[in-house]
Amino acid sequence: MQIELALFAKLSARYPVGGSGREPRPLEVADGVTVGALVEQIGLAEEQRITFVNGRHAPDDLPLAPGDRLAIFPPIAGG
């Protein structure tokens, strides 16, 4: 199935397909893959991160569906 993957800030250099940048990229993944499994597959499991699917916070055990947009951010702090 196909999803969109968007990596932000320093994580954008870790796209599994072609280059870096802020634009979401299409990505073929196995049916029923979870957020956590995909994060591990693309080598970000050890990174501290915040994940969103279709604009909502997503736990690692959430299964992805065709057309979902997975966005991964590094931790953000400010004041």
Model regions: which residues?
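Ubiquitin-like/PB1-type beta-grasp interaction modules and other compact soluble beta-rich domains
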Residues: 1-78
